């Protein structure tokens, strides 16, 4: 069976991408990172998701890119966005170079494990301000993969697959349900804690999609109340 490395953060998008890789016939190898994020709740979710999907190989890598700051996801002194992302602006939750570092390490793992694909949960719709979630970024990295590795120069570079890149969050929820993703086990909240906050921008986008898709029971109580107040 062909292998695929899946970048698994523990969030809904990465979990759905992992499930898609399995549905596409790959043996999935999960890769998660301790990069200095505010909390480890998402890594606990990654473990749970990997187990639920039957992923046997799961690598955790320490790469503390948070130590030089630059993001509200890694710097507790910076407030988390909670009122929506301004169109055309890069959100404060962008972590400088994060996807570039992660995908580079995924390429290393894929080559070592002879994996023919790398599945990414990146999305260019809900977070269109992120420069490293765009199709042209992905295409450029694919070219780099072909030039920077032994398998690449031999014409067998792993294919970067981003099945959700053009999906709206509600479409991702629907796909996740079809693929059997354990949605309640995933974690998208920017804050840590026993339960998702329901206030940060990530929670709001997720809650709105869950409710629109017909699964309000998986949304936060705050998210359900906010939707009920809308005209």
UniProtKB/Swiss-Prot annotation:
<feature type="binding site">
    <location>
        <begin position="8"/>
        <end position="18"/>
    </location>
    <ligand>
        <name>ATP</name>
    </ligand>
</feature>
<keyword id="KW-0671">Queuosine biosynthesis</keyword>
<comment type="similarity">
    <text>Belongs to the QueC family.</text>
</comment>
<keyword id="KW-0436">Ligase</keyword>
<keyword id="KW-0479">Metal-binding</keyword>
<protein>
    <recommendedName>
        <fullName>7-cyano-7-deazaguanine synthase</fullName>
        <ecNumber>6.3.4.20</ecNumber>
    </recommendedName>
</protein>
<comment type="function">
    <text>Catalyzes the ATP-dependent conversion of 7-carboxy-7-deazaguanine (CDG) to 7-cyano-7-deazaguanine (preQ(0)).</text>
</comment>
<dbReference type="GO" id="GO:0008616">
    <property type="term" value="P:queuosine biosynthetic process"/>
</dbReference>
<feature type="binding site">
    <location>
        <position position="189"/>
    </location>
    <ligand>
        <name>Zn(2+)</name>
    </ligand>
</feature>
<feature type="binding site">
    <location>
        <position position="200"/>
    </location>
    <ligand>
        <name>Zn(2+)</name>
    </ligand>
</feature>
<dbReference type="GO" id="GO:0016879">
    <property type="term" value="F:ligase activity, forming carbon-nitrogen bonds"/>
</dbReference>
<dbReference type="Pfam" id="PF06508">
    <property type="entry name" value="QueC"/>
</dbReference>
<keyword id="KW-0067">ATP-binding</keyword>
<dbReference type="GO" id="GO:0005524">
    <property type="term" value="F:ATP binding"/>
</dbReference>
<keyword id="KW-0862">Zinc</keyword>
<feature type="binding site">
    <location>
        <position position="203"/>
    </location>
    <ligand>
        <name>Zn(2+)</name>
    </ligand>
</feature>
<keyword id="KW-0547">Nucleotide-binding</keyword>
<dbReference type="InterPro" id="IPR018317">
    <property type="entry name" value="QueC"/>
</dbReference>
<comment type="pathway">
    <text>Purine metabolism; 7-cyano-7-deazaguanine biosynthesis.</text>
</comment>
<dbReference type="GO" id="GO:0008270">
    <property type="term" value="F:zinc ion binding"/>
</dbReference>
<feature type="binding site">
    <location>
        <position position="197"/>
    </location>
    <ligand>
        <name>Zn(2+)</name>
    </ligand>
</feature>
<dbReference type="InterPro" id="IPR014729">
    <property type="entry name" value="Rossmann-like_a/b/a_fold"/>
</dbReference>
